[in-house]
Structure formats: C-alpha cells, structure tokens
Amino acid sequence: MATTAGVPAQSGARNGEWHTYGGDLGSTRYAPLDQINATNFSKLEVAWRFKTDNLGPAPEFNLQSTPLMVNGRLYSTGGTRRAVVSLDAATGELLWVHSENEGARGAAAPRQLSGRGLAYWSDGKEERILYVTPGYRLIALDAKTGSPVPGFGQNGAVDLKLGFDQDLDVTGAKVGLHATPVVARNVVIVGAAFETGANPKSRSNVKGAVRGFDVRTGTQLWLFRTIPQPGEVGNDTWERDSWAYTGNTGV
C-alpha cells in the first residue's frame, strides 16, 4: 500500500486582509470572518465612500478592480487612466495616488480603464505594489508612499512591449493586459491580452506570451510562448505554417 503526505487546503485570506486578487494564491476568494452574519446583516450601514470620478479625463463607467487590503490599508486601481490609490481602510482617507499619463500609447491600448487590480509583494522589510498600465508597462510602487521604485526597470517601470520576442510598435501595437500580475515568491508573472471580442479583426495580430520578472529589479527572467515555435512541443499542430503569422493568443 502506498501513501502520500497530505497537502493542506487553502484556508482563505487571513485576519480579514486580502493580499492577492483571489484572496490567496489558491484563489479561494474566501475569508473566514464571522462578525457579519444573518442576524446583523440588515443593520449594516455605509461607513465611507471613495469616488474615482477624478482619476482620469472622464468618469469611469465599468470599475472591475478588486482592492487589496494589507496592514489596514486598501490598494486599488481606478479611473480611466488606471490610477493606483491607497486608502485608510477604517476611514477611507486617501493616503496617496499614482497615475501615468501615457498619451497616444494609452489611447491606442486595446485594454483600457481600471483593469482588474494589482499585486502586492513584501520580503518583510520592503513592500511593493505592482500593476500593468493600459499602455502595457509594468510599474512597481513603494506601498507606503506610492513613489516608483527607482531600482526596478527604468525609474520604476518595465516596458512590456520590449523583450516580447517580437518587434512591436511601442505606441500602437495592439497588446495589453486587463488582469493583475501574479507574484510567486520573488517573481512577477505577466500575461498578454488583445482587443475584446470573439472575432479578431486580423489573424496576424501580436502573438501572446507569459513572462516572469524579478520583483526587485524588473529583469526579465523567462518567456513562455503561447504559440510554439519550430522545435517546441506542439508546433506541428499549427498547420500550414500558421504559427508564423497568426496571433491573438493571450493568457
């Protein structure tokens, strides 16, 4: 008889905090809190509100961000330029805001508005907030001040249209990301997305890729192609050399 060691199940977010988009790395989206229940739910009242109307050139109409809560602070994206805000969770006080005006690059982005949110990383000393702008740049911010981390990429930013295994127009290439980055230990994992809709306008759009970056320096560590190239597993399934010209394969 063979046995294997048991693996503990994900228990959900701890202490009422929410450190990742899915609550924990298992994406359980569960918090074992019991203060609010069926007997007192009807007595809840709004404690405070924060509006994102001024976080961009126009009011946002489709806020999809999931805020993070770390050490009593809320972090969220919001507004048409995908600004990042830090709020006091108890009072709603605005602690800091960071916004990138990407001009023509942001206007041409296939995935705009506030996106799904951001990611948090800490080594016990430093704390960082990481997110991807509409123009497809990975930004690292000091979680306490909102300032770009100077040792990450170039002045706190990594241009995701570079190092993409393809020559891309950094202004107009139709690739971006609506999702949050994923932090696994000291690696930030970023995918790619394209224009919404089930029927892409062109079969020869940008190819997708998933990449890992060093969370401290922004150095690209690895790249996984979603369309296998010659010599890679699965390339033979892309018949008539379609691997060479097709795209729109995001993750």
Labelled PLM ranges:
Residues T91, L141, T145-G146, N205-T219:
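Beta-propeller blade signature
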Residues L44, F50, V84-V85, F194, ...:
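N-terminal export/assembly segments and adjacent metallocofactor-ligating motifs
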Residues I36-T39, L87, L141, F213:
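Hydrophobic/aromatic beta-strand positions that recur at structurally equivalent sites within the blades
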Residues A2-S11:
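Boundary at the C-terminal end of the N-terminal hydrophobic targeting segment
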Residues W18-G22, E60-G79, A83, A109-R137, ...:
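Repeat-blade elements of multi-bladed beta-propeller folds
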Residues G135, G146-S147:
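Beta-rich strand-turn-strand
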Residues S11-P57, E93-A107, S147-V170, T219-I227, ...:
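Aromatic (tryptophan-biased) beta-strands that constitute blades/sheets of beta-rich domains
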